[in-house]
């Protein structure tokens, strides 16, 4: 309660008119011990006797009552000026490198602060503490940065702080197994298939989230034409299928392709179709 002690005491009658001033309502906080705020609200100062300094209404000393000067309204309550702030470490280091002829910068003058005002030093210390907490995080590891990101030409374009993107490489067997599993599941992972998904990931040695990303990236590419994928798989399994059907030109296989033993063509004669001559192109 330092601001209450600033109320000056002037001699005079205890009725509140001594020294040309008048004492108003009581400003004592009766709930300060409990961490709250409660005032008596007794109004103007009412002494018990002419020589008493205690209020007969609330029992508080006259210093707890707000004093209003005669003819002048009560002004705002002021705190005492805070002590000058101590120089920071970087200021002290700077003063060590300055020549002796250059004086150190003087601290700004301290003015009286109004009621409920917060010193600027408190904001400065709070900002410094916040910056210290932000800079105390664990820095990233050096192996997260690739040599291509040092010049700012990496895929992330973040300069030296661009994180190198890790790409998983799959074997052909893993790709084929993942494609078969994705087609079996309809290129989507249901919640009821978590057990089968975990077992499949353990079998092929691929992590769960890696398989999900692969299915998401190849869904439109492989699932758009399932017939072509099946035909391609059949061609890989039986590469000799489809050879020898038709004329058999350049393959060394005889036969007319009608299934009988002779080499004669039993198909009906085809009508000769004359192709029209191309029209001349004018330049």
From Swiss-Prot:
Transmembrane parts of this sequence: none
Biased composition (Acidic residues): 257-266
Regions of compositional bias (Low complexity) in chain numbering: 269-283
Single GO biological process annotation from the record: regulation of DNA-templated transcription
InterPro entries on file: Homeodomain-like_sf, Homeodomain_ZF_HD, ZF_HD_homeobox_Cys/His_dimer
DNA-binding region(s), chain positions: 163-226
One GO molecular-function entry: DNA-binding transcription factor activity
Subcellular location: Nucleus
Keyword Nucleus: yes
Zinc fingers classed as ZF-HD dimerization-type: ranges: 23-68
Keyword Lipid biosynthesis (UniProt): no
Superkingdom classification of source: Eukaryota
Region described as Disordered: spans on this chain: 131-171, 244-283
Free-text domain note: The homeodomain differs form the typical one by having namely 4 instead of 3 extra amino acids inserted in the loop between helix 1 and helix 2.
General function of this protein: Putative transcription factor.
Subunit structure: Homo- and heterodimer with other ZFHD proteins.
Name used for this protein in its record: Zinc-finger homeodomain protein 8
Gene name for this UniProt entry: ZHD8
